């Protein structure tokens, strides 16, 4: 490691990654911590789209220097707390909290009318015309202790999901008996989360999908609110509580719960919005119905009050990119012609996200590394043949890949399937003199303004639920045939 007195400035000071394999992320990371794999740790695996809850169980202990995710974070938290107790102590921060979905915040902007407090059109009111302002106490020296225990707010506030608040007093007592209680410190007497198995037990005990008592409790709350019968969806499992030991045997079916909109009562398979359609539970919208018209000011201004077709952004007009279909000589590389095409990055068909994309069998069946699919007509325009090395260049970056020339591709469009990691057969690019990039090297995040709407019914923000997304899968690039004598 070389010490630099004058450190470079950037948006990111330190990048740490915990992973069990080499990826594009680990290549860019300052610190890489080796992680345990599925068969070396205890963990849970399920989603709202799967009818079972599964467990991970170690066949062997984590080898060499690897650790489970929970163990790694516990170790980091312990050392951080030791240092932070002296240097940071207890601090109070003022935090801006967004207006939140499935809360009264969703009615902060009546009729979808947005007034500008900066222009004097309305008062600046926290939680109404601006985010809520919340004071948060941070005891930095107690981070590790708090991480290892179930906090006290579960007793007083319960847990709220999709607008339904669950009372958790009985579950907290159960976890205290199941996991043991913490002795001493700020978490004295609280249920322990010291081990990964303790955390798994807490997750299972605090979810209606794995705890029938909570599922029935949640449906009773919804019944009082909606006036429609719902508890029978979970009553058959009211006495059922799935434990981690249960998941270590055969696959365990989950319980129908108000946390989701589907029904698996009586053994039926999950389908979204079943409860809304069959039991008339209102949708979480302004009208309580499925509807297409959005009367928010911004939607009207954008001409999108009703669903309409929007053509792709004109990158030539917006960012001075060449016009699609344009064929030009690359001045920087002699008279090598380049063709401008629409660049799309569809979801990979040969991997699970980036997992298994580096599988030797899959690489052998394809081109052995990164590739771009293009039409035979576009390839013919610039002298590209199947399996040639090509470079794709735009204002965002450079990609070096093999060409897959196919008549199945439409003229003017290329595909680079996503999650092709930048670590197998990636030569140095002629354009930049640096190693070629990945599928996202040619893209950038473009936030659609209407995604920033908040405080209006179903258009209210919730983390990992509703909010701005990166609309980066619509770009243009210039593709040319590069020298076939590649260097690494």
Residue ranges and their predicted role:
Residues 17-19, 35, 346, 374:
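Short His-Asn-centered micro-motif
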Residues 71-130, 187, 202-213, 217-233, ...:
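Long, contiguous, secondary-structure-rich segments that constitute the structural scaffold
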């Amino acid at each position: 490691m070389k010490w630099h007195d004058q450190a470079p400035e950037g948006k990111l000071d330190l990048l740490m990654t915990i992973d069990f394999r080499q990826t594009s992320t680990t290549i860019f990371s300052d610190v890489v911590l080796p992680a345990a794999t599925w068969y070396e740790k205890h963990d849970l695996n399920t989603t709202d789209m799967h009818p079972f809850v599964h467990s991970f169980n170690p066949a062997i202990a984590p080898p060499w220097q690897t650790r489970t995710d929970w163990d790694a974070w516990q170790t980091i938290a312990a050392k951080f707390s030791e240092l932070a107790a002296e240097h940071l102590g207890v601090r109070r921060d003022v935090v801006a909290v967004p207006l939140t979905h499935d809360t009264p915040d969703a009615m902060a902007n009546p009729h979808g009318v947005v007034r500008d407090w900066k222009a004097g059109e309305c008062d600046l009111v926290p939680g109404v015309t601006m985010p809520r302002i919340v004071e948060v106490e941070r005891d930095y020296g107690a981070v590790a202790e708090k991480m290892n225990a179930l906090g006290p707010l579960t007793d007083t506030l319960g847990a709220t999901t999709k607008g339904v608040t669950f009372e958790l007093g009985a579950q907290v007592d159960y976890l205290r008996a199941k996991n043991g209680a913490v002795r001493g410190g700020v978490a004295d007497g609280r249920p322990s989360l010291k081990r990964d198995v303790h955390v798994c037990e807490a997750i299972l005990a605090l979810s209606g999908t794995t705890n029938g008592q909570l599922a029935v409790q949640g449906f009773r709350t919804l019944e009082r609110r909606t006036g429609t019968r719902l508890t029978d969806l979970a009553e058959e499992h009211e006495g059922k509580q799935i434990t981690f030991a249960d998941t270590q045997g055969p696959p365990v079916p989950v319980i129908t719960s108000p946390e989701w909109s589907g029904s698996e009562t009586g053994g039926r398979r999950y389908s979204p919005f079943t409860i809304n359609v069959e039991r008339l539970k209102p949708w979480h919208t302004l009208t309580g119905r499925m509807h297409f018209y959005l009367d928010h000011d911004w939607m009207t201004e954008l001409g999108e009050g009703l669903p309409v077709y929007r053509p792709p952004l004109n990158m030539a007009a917006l960012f001075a990119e060449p016009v699609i279909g344009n064929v030009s000589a690359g001045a920087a590389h002699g008279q090598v012609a380049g063709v401008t095409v629409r660049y799309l990055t569809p979801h990979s068909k040969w991997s699970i996200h980036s997992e298994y994309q580096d599988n030797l069998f899959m690489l052998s069946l394809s081109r052995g590394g990164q590739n771009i699919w293009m039409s035979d007509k576009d390839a013919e325009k610039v002298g590209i043949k199947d399996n040639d090395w090509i470079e794709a260049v735009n204002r965002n970056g450079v990609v070096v890949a093999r060409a897959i020339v196919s008549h199945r591709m439409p003229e003017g469009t290329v595909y680079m399937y996503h999650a092709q990691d930048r670590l197998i057969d990636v030569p140095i690019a002629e354009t930049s003199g640096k190693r070629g990039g990945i599928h996202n090297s040619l893209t950038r995040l473009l936030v659609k303004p209407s995604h920033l709407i908040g405080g209006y019914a179903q258009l209210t923000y919730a983390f990992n639920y509703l909010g701005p997304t990166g609309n980066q899968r619509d770009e243009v690039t210039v593709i040319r045939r590069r020298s076939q004598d590649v260097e690494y």
